[in-house]
């Protein structure tokens, strides 16, 4: 049975979360009202997973996450309100080592959480299975610039990135090291709640030489630009011409129980994009992305996957690899170089 530590400054929320987890078959072995108490509790009860509030007195969730990852790495699920402030703080906590996030419906003191019991239990179990040390503090190998006499980048390439649990840091690392001269159009699908994807796009934009924004219905991008799929919306490539692509957003049925789905974006890109196409699937649980990788491969695109050793959860890459359509499986620090290599051409 999975053993959990529940950390929240609200006694009400500690009780609600604990009851939901216990009813769902998770053993709550301890609770704490702030980050400082959480540090002691982690040592005492050694849980499999921690649910961590963001805003708490004495020591908040960001500080606590950083300390826990330094002293006793443990999978952490950030449980935060759907606010801009909490979204920023949660993404910072994930940068410090938290694995994933669960959005409290209705605010910091959520009376609606019991209506999302199954989702919370599933998130806790998913995070408990993650390797909290995989892929952190990675120094990306920068892509080598093309040799002016022997090679150059192909024209109008498109890069597709799909990720779930443990993905935000990896996506940011790839974007931060992606060479501007490659001039990719970038489409990113990260399983993440609405309200969070806008802030995630802002972080990627700040870290990258590419102009990254959250997708809107009808968004168009060209070289050097990228879109993050909006939370709770599928992102489909609806048109492609002269190196510019257009996307449409919709709230059609969830695929693999998620929206946005990696497969929706990858398959639509494979159908529409007529110039070089590269896909990479990263850490996460489930099979989303496998069909999309197959579609990209069938369309003549390059396909890459993150390896098990650097994946917090290896489900998504593993399912894609099992299709037989993945060209290369690499540690996270080698992915940017491989992405760039896939569009080099000899002159």
Swiss-Prot record:
It catalyses: [protein]-L-glutamate 5-O-methyl ester + H2O = L-glutamyl-[protein] + methanol + H(+); L-glutaminyl-[protein] + H2O = L-glutamyl-[protein] + NH4(+). GO terms for cellular component: cytoplasm. The active site is at 164, 191, 288. Keywords: Chemotaxis, Cytoplasm, Hydrolase, Phosphoprotein. Disulfide bonds: none annotated. Phosphorylated by CheA. Phosphorylation of the N-terminal regulatory domain activates the methylesterase activity. Residues 3-119 form the Response regulatory domain. The modification 4-aspartylphosphate is found at residue 53. It is found in: Cytoplasm. It comes from the Archaea. Residues 132-154 are annotated as: Disordered. Pfam families: CheB_methylest (PF01339), Response_reg (PF00072). InterPro entries: CheB-like, CheB_C, CheY-like_superfamily, Sig_transdc_resp-reg_Me-estase, Sig_transdc_resp-reg_receiver. One of its GO terms (molecular function) is protein-glutamate methylesterase activity. Contains a C-terminal catalytic domain, and an N-terminal region which modulates catalytic activity. Belongs to the CheB family. PANTHER family: PROTEIN-GLUTAMATE METHYLESTERASE/PROTEIN-GLUTAMINE GLUTAMINASE (PTHR42872), PROTEIN-GLUTAMATE METHYLESTERASE_PROTEIN-GLUTAMINE GLUTAMINASE (PTHR42872:SF6). Involved in the modulation of the chemotaxis system; catalyzes the demethylation of specific methylglutamate residues introduced into the Htr transducer proteins (methyl-accepting chemotaxis proteins) by CheR. Also required for Htr deamidations, at least at a specific glutamine-glutamate pair in HTR-II and a specific aspartate-glutamine pair in Htr4. This is Protein-glutamate methylesterase/protein-glutamine glutaminase. The gene is cheB.
